[in-house]
Design a protein with these regions (language model features):
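C-terminal catalytic lobe of FAD-dependent flavoproteins
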Residues: 179, 308-309, 333-335, 349-457
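Helical element adjacent to the flavin cofactor pocket in flavoenzyme catalytic cores
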Residues: 163-175, 194-254, 258-261
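Active-site substrate-recognition segment that forms the wall
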Residues: 59-63, 67, 71-110, 236-247, ...
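Dinucleotide-binding Rossmann-like beta1-alpha1 core, especially the glycine-rich loop
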Residues: 60-183
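Short beta-strand to alpha-helix junction loop
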Residues: 118-131, 154-164, 189-190, 202-221, ...
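Beta1/beta-strand and adjacent pyrophosphate-binding region of the FAD-binding site
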Residues: 16-28
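Short, positively charged and aromatic/hydrophobic N-terminal segments
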Residues: 4, 11-12
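Glycine-rich FAD pyrophosphate-binding loop
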Residues: 37-58
Length: 457
């Protein structure tokens, strides 16, 4: 990737108002664009794919505020144990890759209680504000996405696991979150779809769920109504900055330069390939997840669920049922592992009745961007004024998308953001304080083959 520099005057002669260029049309990119456009800013959003093709479409649809990061005590040891098990919930393909080995070591060092406590303080502070923004956008723009704020269930199969499930829920109480413990009999009275094997559940009352693809399409339409220009099938090859080192736009693989007074990188797992040449080296791995969607299942749960022992998410959407889950860390662009899709219904059948009676209507696989310390990267890039990044949310991207977009939009406009997020500060990954002199030799942001969306409903 070549970093272009030009005289500052070349960039702004025709710009009647500040223009922001956003790379990535996922939930973080589009919510950033939405809030900027509502404030009267000119915005252009670029994406190599279509709106709703990535993780913002394919996620489980659970807006689970107070969600734990990946860096939990014991997770790294389990990951190493599962490394050679292709059917494990977390599968890491062994390979002689220096970046992966460095990521694994850093990840392991962060899987401790002290780090988790610090992360949770910040992640929990983002929870209620992000749902308020979801509800504001949905109400103002009239988005029909089956949004329901009725919590989610941690459904437990084995009676001996109920105590640990409840203990985990209690850790969120000091942060203002509530929960209810439900017996298996009560759960079946509420939703007869649960099998007799289920011992009970912990009901996280404050969260919500929605159809993420419908939300994304509605959000994209809202952005367009506000004047946001959205260009899909547009590959970004590199960033531009002026002679003073300020971000000044991007250039595409077609040789086109798109000018802007600010640039926001929200390209998911591909973000680091762009930010690295601007002095920000984010240690990120793509963790592929899968979903299957069914119609015709006789009875659906009354709200979204996570199945405690198998880590499968189960979400009702418009009278259909989505099964989502698994983490698969391996090189970008490798073929799907069909056994990972098969794991979803296999992991759900002991909990939910009638899945075998449903008709599969969609399947999907895509990457969740996972940082080595478990926290997202949100804010200004040190050493390059006008450059911002919002990436690395792992499985929290859909949930935290609106609050991330609000924080980024306020930063772009020079306004105080609604939250201070020191744990998510990009400065922790700055190369020599930022703005590296390394301008040559990086892989293009779109170098990996596209991940297809599979069958779409």
């Amino acid at each position: 990737m070549r970093l272009h520099t030009r005289p500052v005057r070349a960039y702004y002669p025709r710009m009647s108002r500040p223009r922001t260029v956003i790379v990535g049309a996922g939930v973080v990119g589009l919510t950033t664009a939405y809030f900027l456009a509502r404030a009267g800013r000119e915005v252009i959003v670029l994406d190599r794919d279509e709106i709703g093709d990535g993780a913002s479409y394919g996620n489980a649809g659970l807006l689970s505020i107070g969600h734990y990061p990946l860096t939990r005590p014991g997770v790294s040891w389990r990951g190493f144990k599962w490394m050679f098990d292709r059917n494990a919930p977390l599968f890491i393909r062994p390979r002689p890759d220096a970046d992966l080995l460095s990521w694994l070591w850093t990840f392991h060092r962060h899987c401790n209680q002290s780090w988790l406590d610090r992360c949770m303080k910040e992640l929990c502070a983002m929870g209620f504000p992000t749902l308020e923004l979801f509800e504001e956008i949905i109400a103002v723009e009239g988005i029909e996405c089956d949004y329901r704020r009725d919590g989610w269930l941690d459904v437990v199969l084995k009676k001996e696991n109920m105590a640990s499930a409840e203990a985990e829920a209690k850790t969120l109480v000091p942060h203002g979150y509530s929960h209810t413990v439900i017996s298996g009999d009560e759960l079946r009275r509420r939703s007869p779809c649960f099998t007799d094997e289920v011992a009970g559940a912990v009901w996280y009352r404050d969260s919500a769920h929605c159809s993420p693809g419908d939300f994304m399409m509605g959000l994209g339409a809202a952005c367009a109504r506000l004047g946001v220009e959205i260009r899909t099938s547009c590959t970004v090859a590199g960033l531009e900055r002026d002679r003073f080192g300020k971000a000044a736009g991007i250039h595409t693989s077609r040789g086109e330069t798109i000018e802007g007074s600010a640039v926001v990188i929200t390209a998911g797992v591909w973000s680091d390939a762009l930010t690295r040449d601007m002095g920000l080296d984010i240690p990120m791995q793509g963790a592929r997840g899968y979903h299957l969607q069914y119609e015709g299942i006789p009875q659906l749960p009354f709200t979204g669920c996570v199945l405690h022992e198998t880590f499968v998410a189960v979400t009702p959407m418009h009278e259909q049922l989505r099964l989502a889950g698994t983490l698969e860390i391996q090189p970008l662009g490798r073929p799907w592992m069909r056994n990972r899709l098969d794991m979803l219904p296999a992991g759900a059948k002991r909990y939910i009745k009638g899945i075998e009676q449903g008709t599969q209507v969609a399947e999907w696989a895509g990457y969740r961007p996972c940082t080595s310390d478990g926290m997202p990267v949100i804010g200004a890039v040190p050493g390059t004024p006008g450059l911002f990044v919002g990436a690395g949310h792992a499985m929290m991207g859909m949930t935290l998308g609106p609050i991330t977009g609000k924080v980024l939009s306020d930063m772009v406009m020079g306004a105080p953001p609604p939250l201070l997020l020191p744990m998510a500060d990009p400065a922790r990954y700055a190369i020599n304080g930022g703005s590296s002199a390394r301008y040559e030799g990086s892989a293009p942001v779109n170098g990996a083959p596209r991940e297809t969306a599979g069958l779409r409903s």
